[in-house]
Swiss-Prot record:
GO terms for molecular function: ATP binding; pantothenate kinase activity. One of its GO terms (biological process) is coenzyme A biosynthetic process. PANTHER family: URIDINE KINASE (PTHR10285). It is an enzyme of class 2 (transferase). Its EC number is 2.7.1.33. GO terms for cellular component: cytoplasm. Pfam families: PRK. Keywords: ATP-binding, Coenzyme A biosynthesis, Cytoplasm, Kinase, Nucleotide-binding, Transferase. InterPro entries: P-loop_NTPase, PanK, PRK/URK. This is Pantothenate kinase. The keyword Signal does not apply. It comes from the Bacteria. Pathway: Cofactor biosynthesis; coenzyme A biosynthesis; CoA from (R)-pantothenate: step 1/5.
Length: 318
């Protein structure tokens, strides 16, 4: 067996071309119209009916199979244990770099899954709400590492997911403002026993250090039943980030309340240079050191090309 064949032999993923993946939709119905699809698209991301039909409907079909199998396993284990336990929410993690389109993917999945029959309750939260407040990050000298694992209140995020998975009612999650670039004081989203919870964030597949004393060290992905990593080559991600920064300079940055209001008067050349500096100082380092190494932990990998369209899909073998 040559080196290439050996690598393929031990590859834990089955890789599909776009057309191969699209064929797996079969008769899954399209439940979103053009207007709804438009509202799900993030700034400077690309999403159209064709992308939903060829990429997300097969995902919806696959997830319906996984959720159904998990429900059967739940009832079988309940019979085995001889106890009556509250049914646990199915949790899906969505990971990937800044500017890759995580929010769009998470919202499309939420919209499609909520239209299954019978209509499940599908909630969505982002881990941005579990970032430490800016004041704390500034005191700790971590503002330049915002989005890195150390910038999150990990105990609070783990406690939130533990409460969700145990079936607690009305669990609160902090709310983050992208306008002020900070946690909104005394504002919370309430998650109340959803059937499915989607958790979106750059580092949700992050692993922890192995304990030397044998004690369990929980990580966020311990609570996931399924996970999606959205992938793209670094030069493509860099270009998307610059384009998004320029678009925000012309829109949201003009709001005096914006944390980035100081960038609104910049010329195209100045704004591009600023975006490149931020990308290289923060986002590229986070991608290389923390985000990309977690890609092999995902159940499903969506690989995007320069046009924001998914070119291939990798599904972890069972």
């Amino acid at each position: 067996m040559d080196a290439r064949s050996e690598l393929h032999h031990y590859n834990p993923y089955r890789v599909f071309s776009r057309s191969e993946w699209a064929n797996l939709r079969q008769d899954t119905p399209m439940t979103l119209d053009l207007a709804e699809v438009s509202t799900l698209r993030s700034l400077h991301d690309r999403l159209d009916i064709t992308e939903v039909e060829e990429i997300y409907l097969p995902m919806s079909r696959l997830l319906s199979i996984h959720v159904g199998a998990m429900q059967q396993l739940y009832y079988a284990q309940r019979r085995f244990l001889g106890v009556v336990e509250r049914k646990m929410p199915y949790i899906i993690g969505v990971a990937g770099s800044v500017a890759v389109g995580k929010s769009t993917t998470a919202r499309v999945l939420q919209a499609l899954l909520a239209r299954w029959s019978p209509r499940p309750k599908v909630d969505l939260i982002t881990t941005d709400g579990f970032l430490h407040p800016n004041a704390l990050l500034e005191r700790a000298g971590l503002m330049q590492k915002k989005g890195f694992p150390e910038s999150y209140d990990l105990p609070a995020l783990l406690a939130f997911l533990s409460d969700i998975k145990s079936g607690r009612r009305k669990v609160r999650a902090p709310i983050y403002s992208h306008l002020t670039y900070d946690i909104v004081p005394n504002k919370f989203a309430v998650v109340d026993r959803p059937d499915i919870l989607i958790v979106e964030g750059v580092n949700v597949l992050q692993t922890g250090r192995l304990p030397r004393d044998g004690k369990a060290v929980p990580v966020v992905s311990d609570f996931f039943d399924f996970s999606v990593y959205i992938d793209a080559d670094e030069p493509v991600l860099r270009d998307w980030y610059i384009r998004r920064f320029l678009a925000l300079r012309d829109t949201a940055f003009h709001d005096p309340r914006s944390y980035f209001h100081r960038y609104a008067p910049l010329s195209d050349e100045e704004a591009t240079a600023t975006a490149i500096a931020i990308w290289e100082r923060t986002n590229l380092a986070n991608l290389e050191d923390n985000i990309l190494p977690t890609r092999p932990r995902a159940t499903l990998i969506l690989k995007k090309g320069a046009d924001h369209v998914v070119d291939s899909v990798a599904l972890r073998r069972l």
